[in-house]
Structure formats: structure tokens, C-alpha cells
Amino acid sequence: MSKKIYCIASFEAKEGLNEELFKALQSLEPQTIREDGCIQYIVTKHITHPNATGKSFPIVFNEIWESKEAFELHCNKPYIKEFFHKHCVLEDGFVKDFNVCVYSDE
């Protein structure tokens, strides 16, 4: 087994702001993918499929990090903290609700 960390960060935009939120999240990709320990960092949109009928927020980040330490460093980067404050905390942000979960394969 590895010490990789798998993060699923899902977001629900406020009414009418889905595309704006998606673009704001996409803007985080180029800088994050260059971080030490980042293996994968991809923002995705929910699609419908007859073999996948579960419920989810419409926008999801799929992240893989080399270690817990690499993930923690990422979470403490100023641009990540700024995104969460601007869009998840402040009233005029794009995010209605969000959920961040981390997993290990150990």
C-alpha cells in the first residue's frame, strides 16, 4: 500500500452561478498541479448515466496527493485559503454548499 491521499471536494453553486464557479475552480488547476506532491488535480462536472444514479454536488475535484503532508501543504497555500474564504465563507461567494473528504488506500 502507498501513503497517497485521495481527496474528493464537491461543490454546489448558488443559483445561476454554476459556470462561474466551475471556471473559478478550473483557475486553481494550473498552480496546484505544479505543487510538490500533487499527482492529480482535476475539476469535473456531474453527468447523467444510467449505470451511475447516485446523488452528488454538480462540481467535483478529484485529487491525488503523494502524502498527507503534501495535501496539508496544499490546503494551507494562500491561494487555496483565499478561494475558500471568497467563495465558501463570504455571502457574495459562488458556493451554496460544499463537502471535502479525504481517503487513504492503507
Predicted regions, residues:
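Short, glycine- and small/hydrophobic-rich beta-strand elements in well-ordered beta-sheets
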Residues: 30-60
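Short, surface-exposed ligand-recognition loops at beta-strand->loop->(often short) alpha-helix junctions
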Residues: 13-18
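Short amphipathic alpha-helical coupling segments at ligand-binding clamshell hinges
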Residues: 20-24
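Active-site-flanking beta-strand signature of metal-NTP-handling nucleotidyl enzymes
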Residues: 5-11
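Glycine-rich beta-strand-turn "strand-cap" elements at beta-sheet edges
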Residues: 2-3, 42-54, 83-106
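An amphipathic, aromatic/His-enriched active-site/gating alpha helix that lines ligand/cofactor pockets
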Residues: 27-39, 64-100
